[in-house]
Amino acid sequence: DFNNDGKPDFVLGNHGLNSRFKPTDGSAVRMFVNDFDQNGSVEQIYTKQSGDRHIPYTLKHELEKQIPIVKKRYLKYSTYNKESLEDIFGAEALSNSVVQEFNFASSAVMMNKGAGKFEIQALPRKAQRSWMFAALVTDVNGDGIQDIIMAGNLEGAKPEAGQYDASY
């Protein structure tokens, strides 16, 4: 109960803002899931939106490990880097994909307004340095105000994402 109104509020751990994945109101980060090369193995590809095109976050050498035809089709990084997912696999492959998206990366608190209504408030910028996997709500300094102790970091991310180790 962060605002002492007698209703339980919630801490929402999330991705944070210190990342290549930066969704905005008009442009979500999307994950396309499909057997793009029809080999019986399902692949997932993260994209950012540029106009009506979906640009892969996945680096060329990472994608060609999953889908070898990419190596034959795009010999140079400079050629691959100009392509959208639609260019690489075609509109039909994308329309047959399962698509998941996220458009809010901040860790936040969800304030209970009562009657089933909630308001989400992003935590301060310092709290967005890394993922939040756990949180403890307690009055750390005895001032009567609830504080949030966060736990995060992730070191096993793919190279195109980088390590998430900026919190302490």
PLM regions: where:
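Beta-propeller-forming repeat regions
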Residues: 1-168
